[in-house]
Design a protein with these regions (language model features):
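S-adenosyl-L-methionine
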Residues: 1-183
Length: 183
C-alpha cells in the first residue's frame, strides 16, 4: 500500500537518492560533471565537493534572482563584466555564454586557491577561455600582500576574509590561511 498522497512524493525520494549517490562518488574522490540548463545555455560544471555539486552547480541560477535579473537584462554584446568573488564561476560562465559571439569579456576574480582551481576548470570545459579570464586576486581597501583566512577549504565554499578573521561581522577560526595579493 502506498503512503498517504499528501506525504508521498516519488520525485523527492529520487532526488535524495541521486544526492546520496553523488556524495558517495565525491567522497571517493571522483569528480562529477553537472550540466545546468539556464535560458538558452547549457553550462557545465566539474564538481569535486557536495557543496559545489548541490549548491553552486544546481542552484546558483535560482538562488540569486537579482544577480540573474541583472545579467539577463543588462549584459549584452561587447560588454565587459567584472565578477568579483567569482567562486567556481557560475555567473562568469553565464555571462561568458551570453557574450560568446561578441567582443565582450568577463574578468573573474577569485582569491581562494580551491575555488580558483574549480573556476579555471569550469571555464575550460565550457570552452570560454577566450572570453572569461580568471585572476587569483582579492579586492580590499588596501593594495598589496595580505592574508586570506579561509573558513573552509571545500570547493564552492564562501565567507572567507582578508586581513581579519571576520566574515559578515562574525569572528571565525580559519581552517587555512593563504597568502593573497589585494588590489
Amino acid at each position: 500500500m502506498l503512503p498517504n498522497k499528501k506525504f508521498f512524493s516519488p520525485g523527492w525520494y529520487f532526488q535524495k537518492a541521486r544526492l546520496r549517490f553523488a556524495k558517495a562518488l565525491l567522497d571517493l574522490g571522483i569528480p562529477l560533471k553537472f550540466t545546468s540548463q539556464i535560458d538558452d545555455f547549457q553550462i557545465q560544471f566539474v564538481t569535486t565537493s557536495l557543496l559545489e555539486y548541490s549548491l553552486r552547480a544546481q542552484k546558483s541560477y535560482t538562488r540569486e534572482r537579482v544577480t540573474m535579473g541583472w545579467l539577463r537584462n543588462f549584459v549584452g554584446a561587447g560588454d565587459v563584466v567584472y565578477d568579483i568573488g567569482a567562486n567556481v564561476g557560475a555567473y562568469s560562465l553565464y555571462a561568458g555564454k551570453k557574450l560568446k559571439s561578441s567582443t565582450g569579456r568577463v574578468y573573474a576574480f577569485e582569491p581562494a586557491f580551491f575555488n580558483f582551481s574549480a573556476l579555471c576548470k569550469n571555464i575550460e570545459v565550457n570552452w570560454l577561455n577566450d572570453i572569461v579570464l580568471p585572476f587569483p586576486v582579492a579586492f580590499t581597501a588596501v593594495s598589496g600582500p595580505d592574508k586570506l583566512f579561509l573558513s573552509s577549504t571545500i570547493s564552492g565554499s564562501a565567507l572567507h576574509a582578508v586581513g581579519k578573521k571576520e566574515s559578515e561581522g562574525k569572528s571565525f577560526a580559519p581552517r587555512f590561511t593563504q597568502g593573497v595579493l589585494s588590489s
